[in-house]
Amino acid sequence: GEEVYYVYYYDTTNEDSSVSSVVASLDDKVYRVDLHDDFNSNFVGEPSGVVNNISDLKVKSPTVIKVESESIIAFFSGSEEIKIGLK
């Protein structure tokens, strides 16, 4: 099958435990990106939603994206949307 994975963008200094537990329960691989780290600040901005090019991606904390075959297929922004979208 095609590789499916998630990327969890969040501020490690202000993590929502209810979101973390939903993310931790996912069956597919999850990559975590710390938005508190200046190295990742290029991702932060007005949430872009699903984009074709990862370089156009903008997120706020917390956000989860779902990636399949190198394409973003879902974008969940904010804790409520993540919890509803991933459960």
Please provide the spans of the model-predicted regions:
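An anionic, turn-rich surface loop/hairpin at beta-sheet edges
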Residues: 35-56
